[in-house]
């Protein structure tokens, strides 16, 4: 299936019925759909990824007024060698952000934080990475509420449920897209239209063109 097939046969939805469309992509959530798209290859690490440029191509089929992408980046560690894992992750995350901007997304980004994690007895058990954009996405949706008729949300995070309910009370339509096994029941029930993303895997696969392209991340996130 290519984009023309998608437009002709699997149409996401008819944009004429949804007025002015704003798209909000929670890319940290969307990126993990790769584990559902290609479970064998991504059992432990991300060996297959979602292509941000192809993602933009699919989104553009519904002729959005604006499209936003939210994604955190690792900090550069100038005191460490360039081939250190942290610097590799930094370059990979910046590469994705640059690609999103070149693909027409308005990008919201910030540093990924590492937080000490302790067990119930107060024993240090490691560090966890944290970088969610719930507040930023909510603020963008609320501040721009008069500029759109429909929110097209790319996420399965149940944390958006209350926000989307509020938007519906303001006569906004909600379209949510997510892999079936990543989608929360709350988002399914409050959406005017829920679209399973699973049939899009072939359209969204990232295929490096040459060796100069940053390698696929071996993160076990």
Name each region found by the language model.
Residues 94-221:
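Nuclease catalytic cores that cleave nucleic-acid phosphodiester bonds
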């Amino acid at each position: 299936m290519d984009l023309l097939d998608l437009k002709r046969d699997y149409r996401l939805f008819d944009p004429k019925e949804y007025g002015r469309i704003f798209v909000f992509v929670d890319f940290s959530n969307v990126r993990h759909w790769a584990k559902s798209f290609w479970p064998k290859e991504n059992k432990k690490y991300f060996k297959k990824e979602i292509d941000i440029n192809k993602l933009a191509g699919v989104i553009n089929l519904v002729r959005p007024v604006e499209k936003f992408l939210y994604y955190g980046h690792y900090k550069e560690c100038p005191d460490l060698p360039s081939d250190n894992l942290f610097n590799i992750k930094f370059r990979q995350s910046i590469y994705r952000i640059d690609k999103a901007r070149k693909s027409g997304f308005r990008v919201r980004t910030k540093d990924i934080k590492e937080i000490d994690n302790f067990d119930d007895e107060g024993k240090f058990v490691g560090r966890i990475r944290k970088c969610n954009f719930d507040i930023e996405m909510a603020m963008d949706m609320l501040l721009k509420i008069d500029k759109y008729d429909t929110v097209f949300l790319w996420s399965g995070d149940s944390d958006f449920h209350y926000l989307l309910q509020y938007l519906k009370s303001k006569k906004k339509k909600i379209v949510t897209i997510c892999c079936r096994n990543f989608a929360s029941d709350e988002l399914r029930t409050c959406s005017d239209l829920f679209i399973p993303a699973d049939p899009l895997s072939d359209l969204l696969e990232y295929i490096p063109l040459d060796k100069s392209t940053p390698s696929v991340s071996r993160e076990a996130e």
